[in-house]
Amino acid sequence: MHDLTSSLDATSLETRRLLLRRWQRDDLDGFAAVNAQPEVMRYIHDGRTLDRAGTAERLANYQRHWDEHGFGLYAVEVKETGELAGFTGLAVPTFLPEIMPAVEIGWRLGRAYWGRGLATEAAQAVVAHARDELGLRRLVSIHVVGNEASARVMVKLGMSLERETVQPDTGRQVRVYAMEL
């Protein structure tokens, strides 16, 4: 496994309730617990949960993405408790070639963190960072048809539905939202 950062990197964002930071070694078990929840993973990729080894592989991929692009997915930590809630951040959506080139904003939170506005709060911080610090001019976000909670977050961010298409590697119908920054 690619070595995860052991301490906070200069690349972190803060909101009223959340710390968005680079991944740490200690995050593996907490993130594996999120990825083991069927209701969380229902609309992710092919809908299957991930075990600890699969989660470790994903975290290594997230680290490689940061190294290659200079941005990526942040671990979302609840400031009040120090708990890992999930992630939010930016990625290059190579799994959907028809929309490339693009930068996608995405999120995944454990079930215990749903319905509290945390995904929107975290994503708003990432949008501001993408615009103000990274100089990006456009973001997309993609959700599997049926994931209305993610669609609501996209709309709250100011995104508009751009197209519906099929994700080639899974055959699932997805909706692509976009916004100019």
Listing of model-derived features with the role each one plays in the protein:
Residues 1-43, 73-181:
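Acyl-donor (CoA/ACP) binding surface of acyl/acetyltransferases
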Residues 39-61, 72-74:
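Conserved GNAT-fold acetyl-CoA-binding loop/helix
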Residues 65-69:
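Short loop/turn motifs at secondary-structure junctions and domain boundaries
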